[in-house]
Amino acid sequence: QLALQAELYSVFNSMTDGDNHKFSKGISDAFKNFVDSGKPQTTDSGSIPTGTFTGASTDGSMTSDSSGCESIIQTACEAMVDGSKSNDYIAEKIAEGLQDLTDGTEVNTSVSGTTVPPVPPPPTIPTSGSAKGGIDCDTSPVEAGLKACFSAMVDMTEGGNMYFASELARLTYTCLTSGTVNTDGVGNLEGSKGVGNAS
């Protein structure tokens, strides 16, 4: 969370008025870096070709694509240029961009456990394998939190960039760690399903 806050703060401090591209790219890149640093943990079980498997993830990775997020925020920034859109609008679009990014995030895990084989047992009984899936996140609290953040910033004469960075980092951290990871076993663990979260 602190690394995300620092990256966002650096983006906001380096901006000049009207620098929409730096804003959209900076936020989307920061989101991507944070999500990609996440560690998924799952509990896995299910009927696989060689029996009934029960286990858990031992390692994992998350990989996201920030291009859709960047495009959503960039388009929103351009729409705000004429002053017809409020701060609530950009709050909605930042949350929408984060939703797009998390929806497209790929989760891969290494899984180990035990398999109860049928009778007679097959020649090979797997105790490990891999799984692939994604993460389901709810970004509505991010939208609500940013609307409150922007409202509070209206009367600020200093410290706005740090406040914005800290709030967006906090909201993003809570969003990701509250999400649900779902995976499906592949190969020798096909049929097993994993459920968990990310840290």
Regions found by a protein language model. Give the residues of each.
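Extracellular "spike/adhesin" assembly and maturation modules
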Residues: Q1-S199
